[in-house]
Curated annotation (Swiss-Prot):
A porin gene can also be found in the genomes of certain lambdoid bacteriophage, and its protein is expressed in the lysogenic state. In E.coli the expression of ompC and ompF proteins is then reduced substantially. One of its GO terms (molecular function) is porin activity. GO terms for cellular component: host cell plasma membrane; pore complex. The keyword Transport applies. SUPFAM superfamilies: Porins (SSF56935). Its main location: host cell. Pfam families: Porin_1 (PF00267). The keyword Ribosomal protein does not apply. The gene is LC. InterPro entries: Gram-neg_bact_OMP, Gram_neg_porin_domain, Porin_dom_sf, Porin_gammaproteobac, Porin_Gram-ve, Porin_Gram-ve_CS. It comes from Enterobacteria phage PA-2. This is Outer membrane porin protein LC. Residues 1-23 form the signal peptide.
Length: 365
């Protein structure tokens, strides 16, 4: 409670530090356009768990470019990088990272093709509930874990409005090349060849969507499961299917997703579940004066975890709010109420059961 009081006080202080900003268009001439965008998220976590307590400030910088080749053909590219702001200068940039780096071509109503580091098609559904002020999106959409979040080697085809014939009907197909990260510290971030699909339909604020993806697993991942089947999945393929619903109109945002994964979901940073059933739901309301309260529930249950049986991997209620001073400046508080109980499973594998409060001040353009 003491840390929560401190966190709320920090939000009040951050409100007094608000300032205005403007977006940056670098170039727009002769059918060529280049936009620069970025964000500074000055934030702090408060938690009884030392690993989740402290400064987590970062900055992101990126650009989006577009060139009109002819009436039906457009080239585009995007790059985004994150710089950590909570490290000593002597520690260098080892934790900085590339989020996005891809380029492609758009063929009018016939869709677009791009290649590079991008979002997996499974995130087309996962993104609907990954909208909390700070937390969220952590039951099954994970960075560098097959096709559920950002990762490398994606070739993606996207088609919006179904060839220009049906407004709101979008679909995508994706291929991911092999990324064999064989060192054990990063083995969960590897993948074999894979493919995935997604489809969404949105009409007057309502949306429905589904996705499916399947990939080969690397030899390191499969062999780890043979050695320790209690904590490492041993299947040769990783699969995910997910479905989602959302409503986004009249200042109201409601969304829910359900998914199941096989030999894919990472828990406690190092281990992989044989199977996981995942549920996320979020509700938000945007007041005209800038306040956006948020409440959510997220749960991931691991199935058939060897001697551990079925166990909750993630389970929490999230209560938070964002206040927008204008389109460039905002502040937030987000309270993750962890519902996991301390037991033999969480203690043995290092699964956190502590609450976290995050507060921050964000400038973006």
């Amino acid at each position: 409670m003491k840390k929560l009081t401190v966190a709320i006080s920090a939000v009040a202080a951050s409100v007094l530090m608000a300032m205005s900003a403007q977006a940056a268009e670098i170039y727009n001439k002769d059918s060529n356009k280049l936009d620069l965008y970025g964000k500074v998220n000055a934030k702090h976590y408060f938690s009884s768990n030392d690993a989740d307590d402290g400064d987590t400030t970062y900055a992101r910088l990126g650009f989006k470019g577009e060139t009109q080749i002819n009436d039906q053909l457009t080239g585009f590219g995007q790059w985004e990088y994150e710089f950590k702001g909570n490290r000593a200068e002597s520690q260098g940039s080892s934790k900085d990272k590339t989020h996005l780096a891809f380029a492609g071509l758009k063929f009018g109503d016939y869709g677009s093709i791009d290649y590079g580091r991008n979002y997996g098609v499974a995130y087309d559904i996962g993104a609907w509930t990954d909208v909390l002020p700070e937390f969220g999106g952590d039951t099954w959409t994970q960075t560098d874990v097959f096709m559920t979040g950002r990762t490398t080697g994606f070739a993606t085809y996207r088609n919006n409005d179904f060839f220009g014939l049906v407004d709101g009907l979008n679909f995508a197909a994706q291929y991911q090349g092999k990324n064999d990260r064989s060192d054990f510290d990063n083995y969960t971030e590897g993948n074999g060849d894979g493919f995935g699909f997604s489809a969404t339909y949105e009409y007057e604020g309502f949306g429905i969507g589904a996705t499916y993806a399947k990939s080969d697993r690397t030899d390191t991942q499969v062999n780890a499961g043979k050695v320790l089947p209690e904590v490492f999945a041993s299947g040769k393929n990783a699969e995910v299917w997910a479905a989602g619903l959302k409503y986004d109109a009249n200042n109201i945002y409601l969304a829910t997703t359900y998914s199941e994964t096989q030999n894919m979901t990472v828990f406690a940073d190092h281990f992989v579940a044989n199977k996981a059933q995942n549920f996320e739901a979020v509700a938000q309301y945007q007041f005209d004066f800038g306040l956006r309260p948020s409440v959510a529930y997220l749960q991931s249950k691991g199935k058939d975890l060897g001697v551990w049986g079925d166990q909750d991997l993630v389970k929490y209620v999230d209560v938070g709010a964002t206040y927008y001073f204008n389109k460039n400046m905002s502040t937030f508080v987000d309270y993750k109420i962890n519902l996991l109980d301390k037991n033999d499973f969480t203690k043995a594998l290092g699964v956190s059961t502590d609450d976290i409060v995050a507060v921050g001040l964000v400038y973006q353009f």
